[in-house]
Every structure is written in C-alpha cells, then in structure tokens.
Amino acid sequence: MKSDIPQKKTVLRLYNDNFQNYKRYNIPKAQLVIADIPYNIGINAYASSPEWYVKGDNKNGASRKAGKAFFGTDTNFNIAEYFHFCNRLLKKEPKEKGKAPCMIVFCSFQQLNTVIEYARRYGFRNYIPLVFCKNYSAQVLKSNMKIVGATEYGLVLYRDKLPKFRNDGNMVLNWFLWERDGKNIPRIHPTQKPIKLLKQLISIYTDPGDVVIDPCAGSGTTLRAAYELGRSSYGFESVKSFCEAAWERLLPGAMAYRPAEIAEQTSLFVEG
C-alpha cells in the first residue's frame, strides 16, 4: 500500500491499552487531544440503517448487526473519568498568548450539553461548537418518513486562553464538509472519521513537530492524519481487533504496542 507518510523524525504509536495507563509509556504532553467518544446509543446503533437487514433489504430478515451496538464499549461511557485523564494528557496553560493547547471532542447532538458541563468541571471553561456536514445519511430507512440526519457534531474545548490557531489569514467557519475517504483508506471502525477532515482540524490547532493524542483511537485515522502532517501522534485503543487491523492496514510503519499483560485497571466503562 502506498503511503503519504513523510520520512521525518516524528513518532507514530498505537497502544493496545486503555489510555488510563498512559504513564507506563512515558509519552509527551499533547498540544491537541482529539477523540471520538462513544455515543452510548447501544443496541440502536444500526436502527435506521439498511445494515439492520441482510443485504440491506427487510425482506431478507434481520442481519447479525440488528439490535447490536457498534462495539462492546459503546455503552456506559464514564465521561468524568475521561476528562480527568485528558486534562493530564494536555500541556499546561502557557503564559504566552497563541500557544495554549485544546481538545476536540466528536459527540452526538444529544451529548453536547453533557460534554460542555463535564468539561467545565475539569477546567475547560470555554468551547467552540463544530458542525460537520455530509452529503449522505445513514438513516436510509427513514428517508420517506422524515427529514434525516446528515450532520455530525463536535466541540473545541479549552481552559482560559484561546488555543493556538493557524488559519493562514483565512476566516475559518465552524462548519466543515464531511468528505468520505477514498478506496485507498480501509474502513476498519464503524465510526471512523475521514482523514481529510482530521487533517483540517489538526492543521488549524497545531504546528509541525507538535504532539497529537487520541485516547479512543479506534481505527487510527487521527494518528495517520497527524503523522502525515509532520506531527507526532500517540493513540490508545483497548479493543485488540481494531489495533491489529490498524497496524496491518492503516498505519504502515507504526510502532505496534501489544502489552503482554495489562494490569488490572479502573475502566472508563461503568459495569452494570
């Protein structure tokens, strides 16, 4: 597979581990933490999608995805623990203007207020809402019943000072086109974000040589986008199958970290 990854002294690492164990890896603090948190939609993940049925046709009956979550950890996400650890992963607030770090969180529309509230509790008092516009919708089965969803949402979260901002003199609007990746980018994760979109966001809030961390890396597209831009990237993904697929198909040359034994840890996902 051809790769656009530059031959620079930047780092690309994906850890098959929970990011709560970040201290064991001695990774540097991040200029940008960017993550797609679980949407907590559980067994309704494919509810309005043709994937609910075999070959997309209800005449064929329900598929194996019917009544299933996107993945095992897409329920009971502990958002308080998430912000507690992300606050530690980011650089401290600098004295200088124009150098502050930030977080970008992808979330559902229903999660926006919750994310804002918990972010404030952990020191991220300011935010900028983001909207991502698609030219398609996953809600195909509802298309003759109602207006269907074709947007994704996110938040730029920061502490006090405005974060580093690299706009090259151009106005940056708070909505972005969501363009799907080409066939050269393998589809590994059900909520995988387009590399082109991730590159836009990373370019706005970081410089070459900065560190980008994705605590819920999934397929690793954030890591690849950052690395191709000359940013060192570190990611954590607890699901082994996603890590294996990312190392093999999406992140050529990545440092693969497979802990032989992962110590007992407090999970971000509440049991019960």
Where do the model's predicted regions map?
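Core catalytic lobe of class I
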Residues: 1-243
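Class I S-adenosyl-L-methionine-dependent methyltransferase module
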Residues: 110, 251-272
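Conserved SAM-binding loop
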Residues: 246-247
